[in-house]
């Protein structure tokens, strides 16, 4: 079946955070991490059938939901999940906050490999904990982990949790099994618990493989929890559904209690139905989506090579979020994003949003029809050329 990712679907006037936050109609948003594509037809059909029923009371999560999650991760990623390990919740960010509150005390340190997803910082701050930054090393156009520094950070008695982002947002790395083994061994040796945010796990490109951290060994499985969701891969963020995979029963009880205390345990019927449909019937659509996203990335790379060669585009191993090195510009990334918005009516994210190490970079969402991507790149070129 051929899927259409080229048609522009108008999103203004739908209360879209991405499209309706800018007040001016001609602003092109390439910032928030959701996609400008219609989701899987089978998901739409399942939701329409449920809506036609007309009653939307409290939701019980059925066995079919757990079966769909278990089957998907076994078939796609060779990860065998016991359904008892699954804790459903209404989003990965609420899950991260609940996990930190369950497993760390105020003033404890949380290790983050920076630059990193901005909500990591708010989850740490809102839990009364302290950030411990393990800076990623940017060398020869690629990021790697500073394992010596990670050893030092993990050896701190106050360090309790490592927030692992895989695939990594915003730098686009998909950590290799070897890298994950080193992370896991360091954390085990120092009594640091791994919280793996793997929400982008379905969006990995040819030549790279997503390895669930918890799948590597029994020891890692017991010393970690994993947060996953169909929201990024299937464009379902507004339905607010996610899962925490926690193999250790004691850890699971603590997290479950924190989720209930923080009142993020209830999910809506549409998120449940969409998850079942996505995992049972979305595989072919997802494969077509990944192909289209990769072609978008190749288009962007050609554009920069021809028009903006002084600004390196980082390799995209996973996610649909491109990290661009703009340090050759005469202005910082905050000023650049402001000029893009005010002068070119284009919204992208400044690297400073992602914490230490992000200055001088911008993040660009390429999950859109290619005509919109081409429009956005022309707007970027206007500012980058002027400020070189």
List each model region and its residues.
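Conserved core segment of the aminotransferase class I/II
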Residues: 45, 218, 222-294, 302-303, ...
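Active-site phosphate-binding strand-loop segment of PLP-dependent enzymes
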Residues: 136-208
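Conserved glycine-rich beta-strand-loop-beta hairpin in the small C-terminal domain of fold type I
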Residues: 276, 292-301, 313-326
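Conserved PLP-anchoring active-site segment centered on the Schiff-base-forming lysine
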Residues: 102-124
